Amino acid sequence: MNELENYISLLRIQRHDFMNDLQVIYGYLQIEKPQGALQYIDKLSKQNQIIGEIYKLQDNEFSLCLENNIKRLWANEVKVEVDIEISNFKKKIFENSYKKKSDFVNTIFMELENTNQNLVYIYIFQDDLGESLLVTNNEDMNDEISWMDEWQQIDIQIDDFKIYKCGFDNNIAYRLIF
């Protein structure tokens, strides 16, 4: 029953968000600002394209976790950039231990948001270490990937999930390797 309740809750949230978006568009049209309505529709289209690219990775639990965090960032007017270099994951990363993994990822996003840099960069890729998610508040931290031996490994006791952190000044990056 818990799964059904979660599903219904998600549907209610999506319906609420959709109705809010319609109200914004309708408001622009009422005050005779069709350009504002078009810009808002364009913004929604770009946001949905980003979310769609994440779901193409074919891990719904992982995608839902990222979607929730990204939408929270957008609601708080934080710019989100997403770069995906793989077509899909080889396995479903969040299928096992979803609650633990999503709670940890949520904590990462909240920490980055609290730096007040108003940017979160998400990079999904694969290299010699495996399929990975890089989340940072500074896109330049992407260059630090080649120095992984200097990153701090975080032990969260979740199988098939390695987490590393790098930070200096107010710049923070996390790399999750699956």
Question: Whereabouts are the PLM-identified features?
Answer:
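Conserved signal-transmission helix
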Residues: M1-Y7
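Conserved beta-strand-loop-beta-strand hairpin that lines the nucleotide-binding pocket
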Residues: S87, N96, M110, N114-I145
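Conserved ATP-binding N-box helix of the HATPase_c
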Residues: R15-I31, K92-I124, E150-W151
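Conserved transmitter core of two-component histidine kinases
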Residues: V78-E85
